[in-house]
Amino acid sequence: MNRILSSASLLSNVSMPRQNKHKITKALCYAIIVASIGSIQFGYHLSELNAPQQVLSCSEFDIPMEGYPYDRTWLGKRGYKQCIPLNDEQIGIVTSVFCIGGILGSYFATSLANIYGRKFSSLINCTLNIVGSLIIFNSNSYRGLIIGRILVGISCGSLIVIIPLFIKEVAPSGWEGLLGSMTQICIRLGVLLTQGIALPLTDSYRWRWILFGSFLIAVLNFFMWFIVDESPKWLLAHGRVTDAKLSLCKLRGVTFDEAAQEIQDWQLQIESGDPLIEPTTTNSISGSNSLWKYLRDRTNVKSRHVITVLLFGQQFCGINSIVLYGTKIISQLYPQHAIRINFFISMVNVLVTILVSLLIHSLPRKPLLMTSTVLVSVTAFIMGIAMNHNKMNLLIVFSFIYMGVFTMGLNPLPFIIMREVSKPQDMVLAQRYGTICNWVGTFIIAYTFPIIHDVLSGYVFIIFAIIACSISAFIWKKVPETKRSG
C-alpha cells in the first residue's frame, strides 16, 4: 500500500544540510539501517502474496520437477500442504486483513513508543512479526493465513509509525529530512525484495519459502536492535539525563561536554512548552484530546475534507492493485514472464521514490499533485483498454508508467499536505485520522479488487481512471498550495 504512512511527510523537508555541524557516524548509520529494516518488513508483507497467490490458492499448478512428487520434498515430508484452496473472495480477505492489523498497530504505536521507548517497542514489534511470519509459513488452512496476516499487520502498522519518530530524533540538525526519506525508500525496497525472491521460488513446491523470508528479516532485525542505543530525546523526556548524554555521544561521535550542551538546548525547548518528542493523544473514543473530538470539531471541516479525499483517493486510484495483484493482472496476457515484469515494475518504483525524495522539497505541492493525478487517470484508462483488447505490450508499458507517475506525486504528497493543512495543535490527531483513512482505503482495494476484476476485467482500471479524474478536479478546486516560499 502504498501509503499509509504519516511518516511520508518527512519527504517535504528533504534537503542536504547547509552546514556539517554534526557528522554522520558509523553508529548513527547503523542505527538508521536497523530502524529502516522495519520499513523493509512492511513492504515485504504488503506484497508477499502477489507472486505466489495463484499456486498458493490451488488456482494454478506449476510443477518444477516432473516425475518428482511433492510428498518427497522437504516440505511435503513434514506435512505442509502443496496449496491451500482459496476462492477470489478468500484471497481478498487474506490479503486485506493485513490492513486491519495495520490500523490497530498504527493507532496505538505512538503511545507504545512514548511509554516503553522506541527501541523496546521495535523489539516488541519484531517479536510479533516473527510469530506472525511463522504462522503464515506453517499454515495449512485459510484461518491460519488470516491469523498470521493480522499479527504481521499489527507489527508493521506500529513499526511504520515508530521508525520515523526514531530517525527524526537521532538525526543531526539538517539531516532529518534526508535520513527520514529512508522510510519510504525502504518500503519500496521491501516490495522489490519480495518480488526478487519470488522469481526462483514461485511454483507449487517452493512458494512457502517466499513467506519464510519475512521471518528471517524479522529475526535479523530483532538481534540488530540490541546494539542500537535508545533515542536520546526519549531518554531526556523521561528524565534519564545521563543516559541521554551517553546515547548522544555514541550516536553523534561527540564529546560528553558537547552532548551536555545539546541536552541543555533540548531542556530549554521543553521548558518553553515545545514538546521534545511527538506527544501522545488520548486513545479513548471520547476523551478530551481524542480522535472523536477531532472529528466533531467544526473548525477542522475544510482540512479534514482535504485529508479524507486525498488519503482515500490515493488508494482508490488503484495503485495497490499492482502492488498486491500485479502478477495476476499481467499473467492474463503474458503468463510466462509476469513475475519478472512485476519485479521490474517494483524496481522502477524504488528508483522514482529515490529521485522524488531528493527533489520534492524544491517543488510546489499543488501542481505536482495535479500532474501526477491526471497522468494516473490517463495511464489507468489506457491500461483498462489494453486489458480489454488483449494488447499485451501496451499493458506492460503503461503499467510501468502508471507506477512511475503515481510515485512522483500522488504517493508522498497527500501525507505531506495532511500535515500542512492542519493546525499545529491538531497535527498529531490529523495524522492519525489520515493514516486510518489510508489503511481503510487499502483494505477496501485489497479485498474488493480480485472480486471486481474477475467480473469486470480491464474495466476496473477505467473506474480507477474516473476516480483519479474526479480527484484531480477536487485538487484544482479545494486543495490549497501548502508549500511555503523559501
Swiss-Prot record:
Ranges that cross the membrane: 27-47, 91-111, 120-140, 147-167, 179-199, 209-229, 306-326, 343-363, 367-387, 397-417, 433-453, 455-475
Source species: Saccharomyces cerevisiae (strain ATCC 204508 / S288c) (Baker's yeast)
Localization: Mitochondrion membrane
Mitochondrial intermembrane side: 48-90, 141-146, 200-208, 327-342, 388-396, 454
UniProt protein name: Vacuolar protein sorting-associated protein 73
Keywords from the UniProt entry: Membrane, Mitochondrion, Protein transport, Repeat, Transmembrane, Transmembrane helix, Transport
InterPro entries: GLUT (IPR045263), MFS_dom (IPR020846), MFS_sugar_transport-like (IPR005828), MFS_trans_sf (IPR036259), Sugar/inositol_transpt (IPR003663)
GO biological process: monosaccharide transmembrane transport; protein targeting to vacuole; transmembrane transport
